[in-house]
A protein has these predicted regions:
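N-terminal glycine-/serine-/threonine-rich phosphate-binding loop
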Residues: 1-26
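Acidic/Gly/His-enriched mid-domain segments of enzyme catalytic cores or analogous surface patches
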Residues: 22-25, 31-132
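Glycine-rich phosphate/pyrophosphate-binding loops
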Residues: 134-139
Length: 139
């Protein structure tokens, strides 16, 4: 049974031994991408389920998708108005970009697929839900 570690981007991240994290699949969130190059660490997956963060970091998220790194898949919801179309067609069509039909309405029911993805209210909770959809049991 594979394990995945969900990582936020708060100050506690500074105390993490990334050599230990490398032993597992990992999921990075939001603005944590800013330290990946410096640490020579990229998570297995990366996402942002916050529309404001998607708006603010759009260009950087697009660059992260385009660059050569070990991130297998990106989970970016876009913004309220454009949803994932916030990103350019080349990004949305990228094989590492996960299509998500994100419901802005808060719903505590676990999603059955990315076609009807319920908002659990935080990026961390939505990353856990994403890991479950990908088949992870140890989160």
């Amino acid at each position: 049974m594979k394990t995945i570690i969900i990582m936020g981007n708060g100050p506690s991240l500074r105390k993490i031994d990334f050599n230990e994290i490398r032993k597992y699949d990992s999921f990075g969130l939001n603005a944590a991408y800013r330290v990946y190059k410096k640490l020579n660490f990229y998570p297995t997956y990366f996402g942002s389920y916050d529309c404001n963060i998607n708006n603010k970091h759009k260009e950087n998220f697009e660059s992260l998708i385009k660059e050569d790194n070990s991130i297998k898949r990106f989970f970016l919801i876009g913004n309220y108005e454009l949803k994932q179309n916030l990103y350019g067609k080349d990004i949305v069509m990228n094989e590492r970009f996960q299509k998500i039909n994100f419901s802005n309405a808060r719903n505590n029911k676990l999603s059955g697929s990315f076609n009807e993805f319920n908002d659990f209210g935080s990026s961390g909770a939505n990353a856990v839900q994403t890991a479950i959809l990908m088949g992870y049991k140890k989160i």
